[in-house]
Amino acid sequence: MKELVLFANLQLFSADVNPINVTTQDSMSPTMKTFYDTALLENAREQMVFTQFGMKQPMHGNKVEWRKFNTFEKALTPLTEGVIPTGKTFGMTKIEATTTQHGDFVAVSDRLELESYDDVIFGATEEMGATEGETYDTLTRNILVAGNSVAYAGEKTSRDALTNTDILTPDMVNKAQTWLKKNKAPKINGSYVAIIHPSVAYDLRNSDEWKEYHKYNDVAPIFKGEIGELHGVRFVESNEAKIWKDGDTCVYATLFLGKDAFGVLDPEGEGMEMIVKTREQAGGPLNQFSTIGYKFCHGAKILYQERLLRVESGSSYGSLDEAN
């Protein structure tokens, strides 16, 4: 019944809201505002697969800033009695990213609120929260897939050379984690992490090595979206893992990460805002609609190129998926 009502009144979600100056008092109580803010943030947080692994910092002005400390060389030269060694100079590098602002809203008519059996405002808030989280995470992903370090499946040397048969294999996973180890990338809770598309995960989970490992190892998930582990890498699934498409061939990016490979503006600080306008505030002279929207600032930056490896591959689903 709910779907029929919503379908019949689909036009009542129209975003053609005419701007009008309305003088009102805020009729939403602080308790209700907190309720809707919490609902939006919880739904947004569930969609943030990439963002969960970033070094989070608050915003300062229109920028977000991270500091990474310089490493030291080994002290292999023996000390000389009575001679003070030269020592090292401690330093750090400041990395900045300019933030961008994003947002959207939906208008809900008074008739839809009256005719629906459900809490339309809360339902719209949940959907807006999910969309906000997906948007935030996609912005983060777009920065990460532009990293300098890339490897290609199937012994190929470029994205253009990849085909749908060049799937991600256990051997490629082993090579990726070896690359991170050789670059001394610290682990995240004892493991490296790979963010993988479900289509690529399907091929990997069909491999004998994956099946054999999980036959004898019960791996408890510790990350949002985690589906399993192989060669010391915990795999986290996301529909937003990057896909490029050319004709019937899709190329998928699987991101292998070490700790603090990138930084991101903390979405739970100044990053996100839920905005609900009641009919009295936004509905014009006849209080005909309310609005539900979100607004956030986003900023992200790769901090350590040597802790982030993008592995591009095909998938047996390559002819069916679309670019994202």
Report the location of each language-model feature:
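Hydrophobic alpha-helical segments involved in membrane association or supramolecular assembly
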Residues: 66, 126, 190, 194, ...
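Sequence/fold signature of self-assembling virion shell proteins
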Residues: 12-47, 161-175, 206-324
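Structured loops at beta-to-helix junctions and adjacent beta-edge loops in soluble globular domains
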Residues: 67-70, 109, 197-199, 238, ...
